[in-house]
Amino acid sequence: MLIDVHCHANLYLAIDQIIKESRSVGIEKVIAVAMSVISQERIVEICESYDLFFPALGIHPEEININKEIEKEIDSVIENILRNKDIICCIGEIGLDHHFIKDKENYPLQLKIFKQMLTLAEKLNLPVNIHSKGAEQEVYQTLTSYNLPNVNIHWYSGPEKFLMEGIERGYYFSITPAVKYSPPVKKTVNLVEVDHLLLESDGPVKYSGQIGRPSMIKEVLNEIAKIKNVPPEKLEVQIYNNTKKVFPKIFAI
């Protein structure tokens, strides 16, 4: 009953091995999350080829920094999302980044594209998978202008002030394998109630030198269970039900 709600499946070279590992530890579903223009079609292709994966399409703020043609290409990205609206389960990974991306000249375009992605999510009545590193205040301010079915803040490690604001708004928070060693991620787990927690690998991001894989979310579940002092079996059911609320389309497609 384990579900990885945030994984960049297009970046794996040995996708068959990833699937085998995932199945072996009870991973039932994985949301494959796009980041770049070039990843959009590959994500859809993977999800059409392997029933473990479900597509999420969107533009990551890092793409604005890397792809100098993004402003010209964004219309084609939007068209692709609309073309695949029946199969995508959320809009993501989208958001703002003022931590890793230091060039402030890119911030206005980040915000413009973030708003375009949120407009799409609102139009399609889809949840969003949010990146907010170093830009928590701006992300939260922007989200207030949109009527979205659900918001998942992925790998939150920012100020407690905005964590508490997100909790008050009813946002969900997906937890990565970094929970095993990261004080900010442990704090997120401590403060967020179990009925608003989700699991993610963010693979293939590395954790202590190991490539992140969906199979790792079993360890994430066990670590959360320790922190929350909840039996892992009970927590697994709770988080599964949380996932059904946030991403209902992966259970209907």
Q: How should these model regions be labeled?
A:
Residues 1-253:
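Mid-domain alpha/beta scaffold segments of enzyme catalytic cores
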